[in-house]
Structure formats: C-alpha cells, structure tokens
C-alpha cells in the first residue's frame, strides 16, 4: 500500500541530496548546502529500506523507474526546464518497467 509513496519519498530525498552537492560544486553555492543535502540522502537510504520487498536488488530495480520520472519532475519544477517528448517517452517506458517489477506475480 505504501510502496509507491515510499519510492516517491526516496526519489525526491535522493535528488534533493544530490542536488545540494550539484549546487555546491557546479553552481558555486555555499558548502552549507551539504548539511541538508546529507540529511536528505540519509532520508533517502532510510526510505528505500522501508520498501516491502523480499530482495534489495528488486527494490532498487523498481526504484530506478520511479527515480527517472521524479528526476524529470525535479528538472521541470526546480530547474525550470520542461522535459521534452523523448524524456517523457523514456520515463513512461521506465515507469512501466518499474510497475512490472513491483506488481508482477511472484512464485512462492
């Protein structure tokens, strides 16, 4: 039930944390950006361990599709660049793949 929202939380926490490093190293922001950035990366790691999956690799694989979509949303909302049609098509393919991994029937 909480799988998709938890993946979304993890994605935005990871992106936010990584963006703090990007801002510091590429946008000449203060090193103080790293403090919330590292906290955000800690939240990301914690959230990803809350995923209801039997294997870490499966949780990470499904997360990849959600992460790609979240990255494009971040690019649009935070960086002001709208995804183009190829971004959108690529993200859709990845999200479909993630949904197959998350909701696909498993043999016991």
Swiss-Prot record:
It comes from the Bacteria. Pfam families: UPF0060. It is a multi-pass membrane protein. Its main location: membrane. It is found in: Cell inner membrane. Keywords: Cell inner membrane, Cell membrane, Membrane, Transmembrane, Transmembrane helix. InterPro entries: UPF0060 (IPR003844). One of its GO terms (cellular component) is plasma membrane. The chain crosses the membrane at residues 4-24, 31-51, 59-79, 85-105. NCBIfam families: PRK02237.1. HAMAP family: UPF0060. Belongs to the UPF0060 family. This is UPF0060 membrane protein amb3269. It comes from Paramagnetospirillum magneticum (strain ATCC 700264 / AMB-1) (Magnetospirillum magneticum).
